[in-house]
A protein has these predicted regions:
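Charged/polar, solvent-exposed surface patches and flexible loops
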Residues: 6, 10, 60, 64-67, ...
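Intrinsically disordered, low-complexity regulatory segments enriched in Ser/Thr/Pro
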Residues: 92-143
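Surface-exposed polar/charged interaction patches
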Residues: 14, 18, 68, 72-75, ...
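Short linear clamp-binding motif
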Residues: 1-22
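Extended, charge-rich C-terminal regions with high alpha-helical propensity
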Residues: 132-168
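Contiguous, amphipathic alpha-helical segments that mediate oligomerization or scaffolding
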Residues: 21-73
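Long, charged, glycine-rich C-terminal linkers/tails
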Residues: 74-91
Length: 168
């Protein structure tokens, strides 16, 4: 019986040691999972901060170039810019006056949905393009606004001009 008692005691001690190791391993897995979740949250926040900054930069640039276009020829362009009631989207609509073909460019910078929408509504057709915020540069927005004013481009147009390509 003494051999049995010793073997039983040894088995129970081994079981207890395995249980302790399992508990430690589970705690380590929990710590690793929590660290990974925290890292993912921090990265998501960093990306959101980058998108918010890009949105602010694009809003400022689009407002500036639209204002410059309007100031250059106020009798030729109707320019409307502003925020939606929710404060989520910034809109710019630029239309021509007394030009052929007639044309309107609508640009929507949507911070919360991480999108930039550009839509041509013209006498020669309509087109729409959608990008992610980080794909759009201030230069692309300036190119779109310049296209509104490019009379030689529109004089023989049979369709709206192609949208600028993202450098990404």
């Amino acid at each position: 019986m003494d051999d049995f008692q010793a073997a039983l005691k040894q088995q129970l001690e081994r079981n207890a040691e395995l249980q302790r190791r399992r508990a430690e391993a589970e705690q380590e897995m929990d710590r690793a999972r929590q660290a990974a979740e925290e890292q993912a949250r921090a990265e998501a926040q960093r990306q959101q901060d980058v998108r918010n900054q890009r949105h602010a930069d694009l809003v400022e640039h689009l407002s500036d170039v639209a204002r410059q276009l309007k100031a250059a020829q106020p009798e030729s362009f109707i320019v409307r810019t502003g925020w939606t009631e929710s404060g989520e989207e910034f809109l710019a609509k630029i239309s021509t006056r007394q030009t052929e073909p007639s044309r309107s460019l609508l640009i929507e910078l949507d911070r919360d949905d991480d999108q930039v929408l550009a839509r041509w509504i013209t006498g020669v057709g309509n087109t729409v393009e959608l990008w992610r915020l980080l794909e759009v540069t201030p230069a692309m927005l300036a190119e779109l606004v310049l296209q509104v004013a490019d009379e030689p481009l529109w004089r023989s147009a049979t369709a709206p001009p192609p949208f600028p390509r993202s450098p990404r």
